[in-house]
Amino acid sequence: MDLRTGEYITAHQATSGVYTFEITNPLYFTITRHNQQPFNSKYNFLTFQIRFNHNLRKALGIHKCFLNFRIWTTLQSPTGHFLRVFRYQVYKYLNNIGVISLNNVIRAVDYVLFDVFENTIDVIEQHEIKYNLY
């Protein structure tokens, strides 16, 4: 849903994309919070954010696009290693498709978390998307 207008994102907006070779470094990955084994449990909670680059947003007609994911996992790897492997696998998936769009990025994250990584228990998605009005 577009946060500015409250309208749902159309299929055309979600699937329109840009070739991967046209834009360098299209996504920005960051870990916003890491709760390592809270309350002596064997689970980790990772919260990370994917932001679209300015050139990618300009090509897709997006004003703001933050994709926030909260992962519940039993992986014990350091957060820097997790982020590096996660970013590599997402870029690999997108390069195989050849087009970067909103739907393809969400599919890439879903593929990496549930098919590539083991021990992912649950993922909560929260998006902040604003399209250009003009």
Curated annotation (Swiss-Prot):
Keyword annotations from UniProtKB, A to Z: Host-virus interaction
InterPro entries listed in its UniProt record: Gemini_AL3
Entry keyword Metal-binding: no
A Pfam family reported for this protein in Swiss-Prot or TrEMBL: Gemini_AL3
Keyword NADP: no
GO biological process, one term: viral process
Protein's job: Increases viral DNA accumulation. Enhances infectivity and symptom expression.
Assembly information from the UniProt record: Homooligomer. Interacts with the replication-associated protein (REP). Interacts with host proliferating cell nuclear antigen (PCNA). Interacts with host retinoblastoma-related protein 1 (RBR1), and may thereby deregulate the host cell cycle. Oligomerization and interaction with PCNA are necessary for optimal replication enhancement.
Family label: Belongs to the geminiviridae replication enhancer protein family.
Identification of the protein by name: Replication enhancer protein
Organism name: Tomato yellow leaf curl Sardinia virus (isolate Spain-1)
